[in-house]
């Protein structure tokens, strides 16, 4: 659901000619991983066809411009210093970056109290700590060291094969939190990380495997500052730039319903046609790949896997103001807390526009209660929470956008998919293994930076490389 008006889509539907119905490789899905796979194959003169269910490109990489000229990324938006594949892509397309606004005091709201502090929650806490009780703070930090040590013992390439993996995968993250934190703040802090920071979901701690959370931290650590920078013009401009290299090789608005394969090739059936190729790459989240029927059927472990990997629960809120008023108060525009709806918010303003933009999120169990309310009540709830962080000016935005990812039938949630208990060790071996002529891509299967754009790029590159080796 989107509440907006007067905006320009950064990745609108392409005006494309009818592509050839036969090619070297068919790519299902035009998210970043699918587009990268198609581009890399095309660059070495293999013919490709990208088939997308939606009427637009990009999947979770999707943006718009406000009437003020400020861009907003309705999907992912940040990049970090160790996300080398994403940084290489930005450099290739001459997309400029700027530091995520962070100057000033951050705000922690906990149990009705407000704390301003000059530090960062990036892995091990850095800088000045919030002035909560030392017992509560020490509880969270001691537990964090235990969590980090446990995560470092994992093999990020093969989490299903790590030492004691069965034991870790049999527990929820909530089990670990209960055992390792002893104060209300410690309990909330780790629950918040699971919901707001995500470690892939976001999910409630009771829903996600401890093994999966640990793997997410090892693969995509907040300690590497993945939200260090934003992009001038937004990440949503990237799909169109890649698509420009693919010419008439993209079909939009054609959901794939069936893929057949034999020893000669594949046939992909959409709601309106059939297309032949030598190989296929399915570049969607696992649950969407599971909606497609296959002939011959997928192996049992693959079929079982796609039934068990849900998307995280997240609605992104983008609220713009005539100026970043919080800076006048010495605030950074970054807040976290156990408020009614908004546990995390961040300044996403482009310094070249003068407009103030706050990105925030309603996640986990909060989402179900919030989305059931009326539009006006939802808006008031979000703005009231932002006022607790930044002051009464937050109640009067210029624009207010709800990006309801769980309602998107061809996405189904955000930020990414997660593994409930038992899934990694019972079915994880089927996550990325090709099945005959069908290969997989998507940020969920990345061994490094899973859940981020960088992970999506890595899997698109890997899938294309594998296909090139077979053609």
Swiss-Prot record:
Keywords: FAD, Flavoprotein, Magnesium, Membrane, Metal-binding, Oxidoreductase, Thylakoid. Pathway: Amino-acid degradation; L-arginine degradation. Induction: Up-regulated when cells are grown with L-arginine as compared to the growth of cells with nitrate (at mRNA and protein level). The increase is substantially higher in the PsbO-free mutant than in wild-type. The keyword 4Fe-4S does not apply. GO terms for cellular component: plasma membrane-derived thylakoid membrane. PANTHER family: AMINE OXIDASE, AMINE OXIDASE [FLAVIN-CONTAINING] B. L-amino acid dehydrogenase with broad substrate specificity. Catalyzes the oxidative deamination of various L-amino acids, L-Arg and L-Cys being the best substrates in vitro. Likely functions mainly as an L-arginine dehydrogenase in vivo. Probably feeds electrons from L-arginine oxidation and also from the oxidation of other L-amino acids into the respiratory electron transport chain associated to the thylakoid membrane, and does not directly interact with molecular oxygen but donates electrons to the plastoquinone pool. Cannot use D-amino acids as substrates. This is L-amino acid dehydrogenase.
């Amino acid at each position: 659901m989107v509440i907006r008006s007067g905006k320009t889509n950064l990745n609108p539907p392409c005006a494309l000619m009818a592509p050839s119905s036969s090619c070297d490789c068919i790519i299902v899905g035009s998210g970043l991983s699918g587009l990268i796979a198609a581009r890399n194959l095309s660059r070495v003169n293999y013919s490709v066809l990208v088939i997308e269910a939606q009427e637009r490109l990009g999947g979770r990489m999707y943006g718009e411009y406000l009437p003020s000229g400020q861009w907003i990324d309705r999907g992912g938006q940040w990049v970090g210093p160790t996300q080398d594949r994403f940084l290489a892509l930005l450099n290739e397309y001459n997309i400029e970056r700027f530091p995520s606004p962070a100057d000033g005091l951050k705000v922690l709201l906990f149990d009705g109290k407000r704390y301003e502090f000059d530090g960062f929650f990036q892995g091990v806490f850095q800088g000045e700590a919030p002035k909560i009780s030392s017992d509560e703070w020490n509880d969270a930090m001691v537990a964090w060291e235990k969590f980090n040590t446990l995560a470092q013992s994992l093999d990020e390439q093969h989490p299903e094969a790590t030492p004691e993996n069965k034991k870790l995968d049999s527990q929820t993250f909530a089990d670990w939190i209960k055992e390792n934190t002893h104060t209300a703040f410690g309990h909330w802090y780790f629950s918040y990380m699971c919901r707001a920071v995500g470690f892939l979901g976001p999910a409630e701690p009771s829903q996600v495997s401890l093994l999966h959370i640990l793997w997410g931290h090892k693969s995509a650590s907040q300690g590497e500052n993945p939200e260090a920078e934003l992009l001038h013009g937004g990440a949503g401009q990237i799909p169109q730039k890649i698509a420009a290299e693919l010419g008439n090789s993209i079909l939009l608005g054609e959901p794939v319903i069936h893929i057949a394969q034999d020893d000669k090739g594949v046939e992909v059936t959409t709601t309106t046609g059939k297309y032949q190729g030598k190989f296929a790459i399915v570049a969607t989240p696992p649950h969407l790949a599971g909606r497609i029927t296959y002939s011959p059927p997928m192996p049992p472990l693959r079929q079982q896997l796609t039934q068990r990997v849900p998307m995280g629960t997240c609605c992104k809120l983008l609220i713009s103001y005539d100026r970043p008023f919080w800076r006048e108060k010495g605030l950074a525009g970054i807040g976290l807390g156990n408020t009614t709806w908004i546990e995390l918010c961040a300044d996403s303003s482009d310094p070249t526009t003068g407009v103030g933009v706050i990105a925030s999120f309603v996640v986990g169990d909060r989402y179900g209660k919030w989305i059931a309310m009326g539009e006006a009540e939802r808006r008031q709830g979000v703005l009231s929470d932002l006022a607790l962080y930044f002051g009464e000016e937050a109640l009067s935005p210029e624009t207010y956008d709800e990006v309801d990812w769980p309602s998107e039938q061809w996405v189904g949630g955000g930020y990414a998919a997660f593994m409930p208990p038992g899934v990694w060790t019972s079915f994880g071996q089927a996550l990325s293994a090709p099945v005959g002529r069908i290969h997989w891509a998507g940020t969920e299967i990345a061994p490094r930076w899973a859940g981020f754009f960088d992970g999506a790029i890595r899997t698109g590159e890997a899938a294309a490389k594998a296909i090139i080796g077979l053609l």
